Amino acid sequence: MVTGGFSNYNYAKTTEVIDLANPNIKCQNMAKLINLREGAVGGLIKQKWPLICGGYPAVDQKNCEVIGGIDEMELKLDLLERRRWAASQVWIDEQLWVTGGIEGPSITSEIVNIVDGKVATSVMLPLYIGDHCLVQVTSDLFLLIGGIGGGLNERNVSDETWWFSIGTFGWSKGPKLNQARRNHACVVFKDLTTNNTVVAVVGGSNSTTSDLLDSVEVFDGQSWKYGPKLPVPLESSKMVSKEFSGVLMGGYDGSFPTSVMRELTCEFGTCFWRKMSQKLQEPRRDFVAMIIPDSLTNCTNES
């Protein structure tokens, strides 16, 4: 499922559902966003309701909304304590951990309990950061990757990574990227043959303007190694995880948002790209993407 972001000349409010396994299966769109949202965050509540928070302009960049199913049911929520766009998030046991953001950039984060709508815990980040990635690598370990920020009032593109452990509830420095980057996409999946965990960082920009990157970096457990390049430089795309691959969607190629989708797979530590038959209906950048169960939408096989 993808929603929000920026299309060719306007904000995108449509919510598309794409079957990642079969290009012949076409799914009915879900309800449109109530608010315009570029650079928002989101997750799936109880495997049923897609929650979207923050983003620009989105009124005050704090409000959230739940996208209903195909019956157009929608709910408005107000959960975030701070204005956030270009933040990054992970979903942990019905809690949305939202980190950083360009409003600052921010050194704060918040863990929102969806059940009661309250902030359960606030975790200070190791630096002021936005346009970064946050991914869950194991049940205990999370990895914050790249972005723009640094110290207070700094706007440096970062090559740093930081581990966060739930066990110690603290941060520790991870291995540096080969290339400092912001507005990149990140994904975690398993190697098809070895079953090893793959962490991949894709594209982005290495400047405060728009010097786009086509490079890909893959974490081998010790350091970052360059992987297969993108066919074109790309920033502001999104990736979702399948068990043995990562799917790259949309993004900005330096001229326009794109609708192209590509799949990254690794075998025996060697990774490769495959262009998918599926495409986004609406080209977009800086959107929200997530995996949803089949029960949330109505799909038909058109083969």
Where are these regions (language model features)?
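Kelch-like beta-propeller repeat domains
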Residues: 1-303
